[in-house]
Amino acid sequence: MSNRIEFDTAETGLRAVLKDYPEIAMKAIWESPEGLGSKVVWDKANERLKGKTISRASIINFLEAMREMGVLKGVEITGKGGHRWIYSPAMTEPQFKTFIAETILGNLKRDFPEETRRAIANVS
């Protein structure tokens, strides 16, 4: 995942912006506000994917993208095997959903100001 938000209009809920393993990773971290290392998140993702597996590098890349976006916090620690990150929520799930909505609406207003205002008025 890059540092951008992609909205899939064919999906609903968090799946509109997060695919299977990223959604599992975020839920695991929201369930553990004290923080988790990438290995624990990777283990949880592979356990919950039921028959499908994801690479640890994919998990690490996703967690880092979320940290760079400010969705997650990260603390680098040193331990057996070297340096590693512990990730914890910088945003709750409701705050993340608000962040997504504000980001998408902000971009729509920037790129299609009149059309976005009309669409919001029609939906409200």
Regions found by a protein language model. Give the residues of each.
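Amphipathic alpha-helical dimerization/coiled-coil segments
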Residues: 94-124
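Short acidic, hydrophobic short linear motifs in intrinsically disordered regions
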Residues: 35-45
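Basic amphipathic alpha-helical segments that dock to polyanions
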Residues: 59-69
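A short, conserved structural fragment
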Residues: 67-77
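Short alpha-helical segments that sit at the start of domains
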Residues: 1-27, 32, 92
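Short, cationic-aromatic polyanion-contact patches
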Residues: 18, 77-98
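Short helix-coil junctions and helix-kink-helix linkers
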Residues: 43-56
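Short helix-capping/hinge SLiMs at alpha-helix to coil transitions
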Residues: 29-35, 48-50
